[in-house]
Amino acid sequence: DTLSALSGIDKNQLSRANQVDAALLENNLRSGIWSTEVNQQWAWNPLYYQSLAGGALYTLMSREFAPLPRRLENAAARMEKLPALLAQARSELQPARVPAPHAATYAQQNPGVKSIVNDMILAQKDQLSGARRARLEAAAAACNAALDEHQHWIETTLQPAAQADYRVGAEAF
């Protein structure tokens, strides 16, 4: 356990710079533990999944860090995984723990992922040919279908049941 090992270090024996690093590391570890054990965003915050889904595609396509054909191939690989991520979101989110404003925002933002697929990725499909283009088109079609299914779940299951308080509360904080 890293936190236990860190607490065993005599901080007074460290240089000032290493004391600062040790404090940063300890705070980061404690924050991670709190996030996992107490906050549990995956269970109540649908925007956590929105950030994963949208960010996985948007950051890939919005920055020219690699040639476009390579980024399109990577986008196909990510789109192939997106249906499983959305299924996991439906499995992990506990609608009664979701605040209504979060559910409403999610319902409005989820279609944005489709616009990334259609307007940023598929609009560039002519950069690929043959099997690579076919893979991109198939991945986009499956991704769009999964996003439609997910939108239906958001509107019919998540939003009607989202009643939780959006504040963390004194006990958890």
Where are the predicted features?
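N-terminal maturation segment of proteins
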Residues: 1-173
